[in-house]
């Protein structure tokens, strides 16, 4: 079948009843919703609870008959978390002209929220994972690979980890922003966008896939071929407004609250690149562990971020790929990644000395070579997923 694997969405009628009864709290209403309404209330009223599908009376038997390699989803759906509602545009709304009124008088907009797609597996182990993408990316990066294999969300779903895949505010399916006009164009597009929009070649070099596209570094795990590179570049997702780390962290805090209300469990927070920098600012109350994949930086010892993580006792592991210590010295990005890696090592040393729990994994030291900044999309992404799963198990999160 497509992408070489089967996704079976199975839920017997009895399971539907039991899960609905056991999940009385769902992600709460975002600002502007009627008081007391919840996401579950809204979906239940419309008969759309989690876009669920059922296989009446066949769940247990089918589960026994199907290979363990098949991904079986009990429930899936989408919701938004956080965000604000803009003040009404000056003037009175006229329903007779509605969208033809270019003044937008009386209109409001729901903006700057995060959007979440979730999947809960039949073998849910009670340790949900919240995934946050990096710069120029969306949740798609966790869900597949450039050559069409299973992404990390599928690999961890098979291990029993529910997936909550985030598009951060002003990105992807969370594109509505206060800096956007009602017709979908940025008020500040001309002056803001061109200054920080790398092209394909710049991404390729900075992400350590190869020196210049389409060549790959020797021993690279990045998928081979023109089609894989084409698919990778087409994952790139622009911002619809200015990046705001404080705003993003608040929205992710709301996501964590919603996941806790929905599952009754704290979440493992898996971040990547720019998302890693945001991740350190997210409120910690509903986070059980952090897995940071080449984060854009790490907290300074003694900082507010650092103390918050330390006091919460959150275990942290930080992963780095190849071509850092051995990267081309004439490429400025090599120095950047060396500094980021060294900063992470210093963070871990301080965090552990102060009673915390942090490991920094440099994959070549583990005998895992050839990985770029996108290790979760490369040909050995399953090997790295297993490595992380072993760490989670060592923390009792399995």
Residue ranges and their predicted role:
Residues 59-124:
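N-terminal cap/lid segment of alpha/beta-hydrolase-fold proteins
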Residues 126-134:
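Short beta-strand element of the alpha/beta-hydrolase
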Residues 133-145, 296:
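Active-site glycine-rich loops that stabilize anionic/oxyanionic intermediates
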Residues 149-174:
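Conserved alpha/beta-hydrolase
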Residues 246-267:
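Conserved acidic catalytic loop of the alpha/beta-hydrolase fold
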Residues 292-363:
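The feature captures the conserved acid-bearing segment of alpha/beta-hydrolase catalytic domains
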Residues 374-398:
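Catalytic active-site module of serine/aspartate enzymes centered on a nucleophile-bearing elbow/loop
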């Amino acid at each position: 079948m497509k992408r070489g694997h089967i996704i079976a969405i199975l839920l017997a009628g009895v399971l539907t009843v039991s899960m609905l009864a056991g999940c009385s709290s769902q992600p709460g209403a975002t600002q502007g919703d009627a008081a007391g309404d919840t996401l579950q209330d809204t979906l239940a009223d419309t008969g759309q609870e989690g876009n669920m599908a059922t296989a009446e009376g066949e769940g247990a038997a089918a589960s026994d008959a199907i290979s363990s390699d098949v991904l079986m989803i009990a429930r899936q759906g989408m919701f938004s978390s956080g965000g604000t509602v803009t003040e009404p545009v000056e003037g009175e709304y006229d329903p007779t002209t509605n969208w033809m009124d270019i003044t937008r008088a009386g209109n409001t907009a729901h903006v700057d929220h995060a959007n979440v797609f979730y999947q809960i597996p039949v073998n849910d182990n009670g340790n949900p994972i919240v995934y946050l993408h990096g710069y120029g990316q969306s949740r798609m990066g966790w869900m597949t690979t450039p050559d069409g294999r299973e992404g990390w969300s599928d690999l961890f779903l098979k291990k029993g980890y529910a997936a909550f895949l985030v598009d951060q505010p002003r990105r992807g399916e969370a594109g509505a922003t206060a800096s956007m006009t009602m017709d979908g164009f940025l008020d500040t597009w001309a002056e803001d966008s061109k200054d920080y929009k790398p092209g394909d070649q710049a991404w390729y070099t900075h992400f350590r896939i190869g020196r210049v596209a389409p060549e790959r570094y020797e021993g690279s795990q990045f998928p081979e071929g023109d089609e894989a590179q084409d698919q990778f570049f087409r994952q790139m997702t622009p911002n619809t407004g200015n990046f705001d780390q404080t705003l993003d962290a608040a929205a992710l805090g709301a996501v964590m609250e919603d996941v806790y209300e929905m599952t009754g469990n704290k979440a493992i927070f898996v971040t990547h690149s720019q998302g890693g920098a945001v991740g350190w600012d997210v409120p910690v109350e509903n986070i059980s562990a952090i897995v940071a994949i080449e984060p854009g930086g790490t907290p300074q010892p003694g900082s507010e971020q650092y103390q918050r993580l330390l006091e919460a006792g959150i275990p942290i592991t930080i992963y780095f790929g190849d071509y850092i210590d051995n990267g081309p010295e004439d490429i400025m990005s090599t120095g950047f990644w060396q500094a980021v890696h060294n900063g992470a090592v210093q963070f871990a040393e301080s965090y552990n000395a102060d009673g915390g729990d942090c490991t920094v994994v440099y994959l070549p030291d583990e005998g895992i070579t050839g990985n770029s900044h996108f290790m979760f999309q490369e040909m050995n992404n399953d090997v790295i997923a297993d490595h992380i799963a072993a760490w989670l198990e060592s923390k009792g999160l399995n």
